[in-house]
Amino acid sequence: MLGRSTGVTILNILPPHDTGGFNYVQASACDVPFPDKSFELAFSNSAIEHVGSEENQFKFASEMMRVGKRIYCQTPSRLFPIDPHLSAPFLHWLPASWLTPQFLRYFTVNGWLWRKPYQYDVTWISKRKLQKMFPGCKITTERFLLMPKSFTVTN
């Protein structure tokens, strides 16, 4: 790495509140404003399930593969009994229409705290769908007590 410039660029749809000295770009991960293979690593941890529709998830995956020479994309598994977004067991298996702020207030650990609205907007992704989104990439299943906890995509 001698003689090479290194840095971290954070891409987020929300405006920055504290960049912590990192490069910050406010943009959609479904339409990244960088040329092909601009980054050594495109990294995403538990974000792809928050971009909305399946179409947006495919765009997100495509953009990661386009701008990153290498990729690392992690997303939680809906099959795991505890939803990391709600910090509660089994609720994410209920119909989405039930997951109102009023309902979550009484049935989740974090419900007693103020929650940002985007935390309710989760579109779960199966391992099979990840394989379609990231062709040619390796998908690893993280397990806890034999149950699939999350999926990680790498190339």
Ranges and model annotations:
Residues 86-89, 104-118:
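Short, glycine-/aromatic-enriched active-site segment of Class I SAM-dependent methyltransferases
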Residues 70-101:
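Conserved class I S-adenosyl-L-methionine
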Residues 122, 146-152:
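Short hydrophobic/aromatic beta-strand or adjacent loop that forms the aromatic wall/cage
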Residues 114-138:
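Short alpha-helix
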Residues 136-147:
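Conserved S-adenosyl-L-methionine
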Residues 1-80, 155:
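Conserved SAM-binding loop
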